[in-house]
Amino acid sequence: SFLVSQGASSTGNELDDFFDFHCDAPSPSAINQQRDKLKPQVLEEVCHQLLLSLLKLDPPSPYRFLAADGSSFSFFSTPKLAPDEYFVSGGHSAKGFYSLHLNALYDLNSHTYMDAVIQPVHFKDEFKAFCTMVDRLETLEGTSDIFIADRGYCSYNNMAHVLEKKQFFLFRSKDVNVRGIAGHLPLPKQGSFDLCLDIVIKRSHSRKIAASGDYVTFVGAASTFDFLPYGSLDTYTLPVRVVRFPLDDGSYECIMTNLPADEFTMEDIKRLYFSRWGIETSFRRLKYTIGLSSFHSYKPEFIKQEIWAKLIAYNLTETVINHTVVETRKNTKHSYKVNFTEAAHICRVFFRLHSRKNPADVMPLLRRKLIPVRKERSFPRLQTAHFRRPRYFLYRAA
């Protein structure tokens, strides 16, 4: 449980806290030697098995809303310890830095990470990672999954992987007036609309192919489509619903989905897409509250260990919050929820089970750590780069 409960301080300070300042506590060097024997795949499997057990706690629901997105993490290393596939030479830093990319699937209802794929920065492939997570996701009996993602995930192959899983997708696409998937479809070029059509995919220019549909497109050898090999004389049909709605600033948003129109209206589609922002908030909490912006090693394999450990810590914290009964006075101006920052600290201490003779009673503590829910507040997204150089090991809070 040391990696799961580790904070942002130096490894030495974390060991002192974990072992209650015991003189016989292992040294940072000893911990690193033991970590060298541990493969990141072990912690990945622990994370997946934990999720399977947590799913049993949730009540059955007709739909599960899953947001997909990615975030990059930078760390210090040397050419001796990290291959070139992790090194970024220019751009944000004159000296260069090392980086990897986390692709994640996030449950917007339970606020937990359902799966993740970690890639070196130079082998970043969000399309491939998304398909991997969709294919291996454990489906729930009686529950349909809705995969929600921004326009960086809108591709024929991603849609097909979700359809083959017999689930639903909701992808933002480029607008109809911009070159992209929606821009090539036979759709109105202005105003709002909600239309269904069939996209027929072919991978050969042979005249033997009798393709008929609302829109027929050719996917070349340079593009990936896993359900129809290049040169095949067969076709693949994608039933798609395209929804275009106005925003407050007068612009329009275009959504591609396969959700049934009789069950999900245009307003429902709009609300579902904007709920995707939950995964952006979770990345901020994962980095700066759980402490994933402060790594404790130079080795990429150790960094992957810490990422999986922090995902475990995040999921456990959110699960404890979800099962905390919030009690407030009647007729309050706002509804209240548990403060995630306070909860993360309490749970981190609680995870150090072996070092606490009398572990804290977590639930009553969390009921005292409440903050108001102010849904009416909104803030403009920063237009500047969010890159932050990783912290040197010497510059850590005591």
Regions found by a protein language model. Name each.
Residues 1-9, 26, 30-31, 35-38, ...:
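Single, function-defining residue in the core of a domain
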Residues 7-21:
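Short, charged amphipathic recognition helices of the HTH superfamily
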Residues 14, 56, 266-267:
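Short hydrophobic/aromatic segments of transmembrane alpha-helices and their interfaces
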Residues 41-54:
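Short Lys/Arg-enriched helix C-cap and helix-to-coil transition segments
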Residues 55-60, 75:
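Long amphipathic N-terminal alpha/beta scaffold segment
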Residues 64-66:
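Conserved beta-strand elements of the Class I
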Residues 81-85:
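A glycine- and small-aliphatic-rich helix-loop capping segment at beta-alpha/alpha-beta transitions
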Residues 86-91:
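Conserved mixed alpha/beta core segments that line enzyme active sites in large multi-domain catalysts
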